[in-house]
Amino acid sequence: MLLKLKCTVNNYAWGPKGNSSMAGSLALDGGHIPNLDKDKPYAEFWVGTHANGPAHVIEKDIALKQLLATSPELQGKHEKGNLSFLFKVLSVLGPLSIQIHPTKEQGKLLHATDPKNYPDDNHKPEIAIALTEFELLSGFRQHSQISEYLKLYSEIQELLTEEEKSQIDSLGSYGESSAQVLKKIFSRIWRTPKEKLQIVVDKLARRIQGHENKTALDEIIVYLFTLYPGDVGVFAPIFLNYFKLQPGEATFLEPNMPHAYLKGDCVECMADSDNTIRAGLTPKYIDVESLVEMLNYDETLLPKYIPNELDDGSLLFTPRGIDEFWVQEVKGPAGSIYQLPYSESCSVLTVLYGTATVTLGDASQVLNRGEVVFIGATHDAERPKINISDDFLAFRAFTPSPRALESLSNKRLIID
């Protein structure tokens, strides 16, 4: 079964305004919204069944969640009624919050104790695939490098105790766990009362602003300071890796990995959750205590994710240890035919650019930029075929079957 979907858009303040937003223009071109307001930000385009942004089946005029609940034959035996994933297109003009996402156990606890700010009980591992050059902070730097930066940006030490100052040199060395030392230092800084914090943030940022030859790190700190003066998140680049993804490159964000997107466009896929623990660079609710206790303080090399390359040259993103989602890149030049694999799973296909006709059995749908189609589980020998009219790029998100997950472990990949 092939069914076009009407999906939702979120207007978070960090998104570009009007038609400068890829997420917004996709939503407009795909018929998901009637127009673009030039003065309104368009940050995220959602495809999924999450309660905060559920997709609807256009021709049946019902929520996709409702259709799946009443038509179990559209899914595989391993699927659970709702989509187990949430697919997004993000357009980022200003920085997102310093944040982490919880494990399953932590998600249950957060939701039970604070359902207003943690709207579900799930974890939220996620993969981000760049569509344009994409800048972000993610994962802790090498601890020895953090040690050097705490000396270089010495104003930060005004927030530490004498004991904590004396431990800066031990970051990256043996003895007491380097991660435990980092936790002490990071927690102290992030727990600093706002009034004291503002003084030190301002002092550091204004000194850097006076530099004639600013380093790349100087520039990021000053940039964050101009947007969030006095905010503890201004210090984040001192602790976290800064890097850029080029189009097609990806990063996988495990639970409790600190990160903040800074600029660019990407697609994201994650477990079906909207749980985010924030602590800086945001006017939204922040939860410093949960963040500093749950953070993974291990050092992380640049966390780029290397996908599987398929025989046709397209890419398949299969983060290990995650059974809720895989993402398949679907692309081809005008005049080509792309055949999707047999699948025990339902999937959603979101078109980034181009035009194509998708055929499955007797059903067919013409897809243009921004349109989204739900593809029911095929179960047998049926294979969806995509006849490409114009140069085409889309992403197919689905929940892999147990057989597919096992094939990943055996290094003999099966896509279903």
From Swiss-Prot:
Residues reported to bind Zn(2+): Q99, H101, E126, H259
Pathway: Nucleotide-sugar biosynthesis; GDP-alpha-D-mannose biosynthesis; alpha-D-mannose 1-phosphate from D-fructose 6-phosphate: step 1/2
Annotated active site: R278
Keyword terms of this UniProt record: Cytoplasm, Isomerase, Metal-binding, Zinc
Places the protein is found: Cytoplasm
GO molecular function: mannose-6-phosphate isomerase activity; zinc ion binding
Cofactor detail note: Binds 1 zinc ion per subunit.
Reactions this protein catalyses: D-mannose 6-phosphate = D-fructose 6-phosphate
Enzyme class: isomerase
Gene Ontology CC terms, in alphabetical order: cytosol
UniProt-listed Enzyme Commission number(s): 5.3.1.8
GO BP: carbohydrate metabolic process; GDP-mannose biosynthetic process
Chief localization: cytoplasm
Cofactors (names): Zn(2+)
Claim: Cytoplasm is one of the keywords in the record: yes
Main function: Involved in the synthesis of the GDP-mannose and dolichol-phosphate-mannose required for a number of critical mannosyl transfer reactions.
Family per similarity comment: Belongs to the mannose-6-phosphate isomerase type 1 family.
Protein name: Probable mannose-6-phosphate isomerase
Organism name: Caenorhabditis elegans
